[in-house]
Amino acid sequence: MARRIEAEEELLANADLVITSTHNEIEEQYGLYNFYDPAHMTVIPPGTNLEQFHPPVDDEQIAFATQVERFLEDPKKPLILALSRPDERKNILTLIEAFGESQPLRQAANLLIIAGNRDDIRDMDSGSQSVLTNVLLLIDTYDLYGRVAIPKSHRADEVPEIYRLVAA
């Protein structure tokens, strides 16, 4: 922990600008450091760009749909979306278990899991490997083939489109 604090002190001493998401973060988190300088800190609050995130327009063709539909037996069913990095704390596995154990839910909807980007699970860090391996095992355990879509990759600029696909 001491090495981490030392490294953070060095970064603060040499940074031209530190970006935080809240003023509270500037005061409470960085205020404890020796090189605390609020003049070199700015807040960019999290938020949603409503120009990008909007309901689908009438006959809008959503390109990402082809990446999803190839997994699904009945792509016309509504989608339940989980979009996160493959991290145990994100509870992707619990979602799959709930979906797998609920026949009414499986009959009513498909599950779309966007869990980060990958080429080969074996090349990922051990935490991501574990989550994704268990995702695949649960899909197999509950025989969710044709009901779960889990594309290997997406771009950040496709996220609004993914939400429109789910809302369509």
Feature locations, PLM:
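Catalytic cores of nucleotide-sugar-dependent glycosyltransferases that transfer UDP/GDP/TDP-activated
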Residues: 1-168
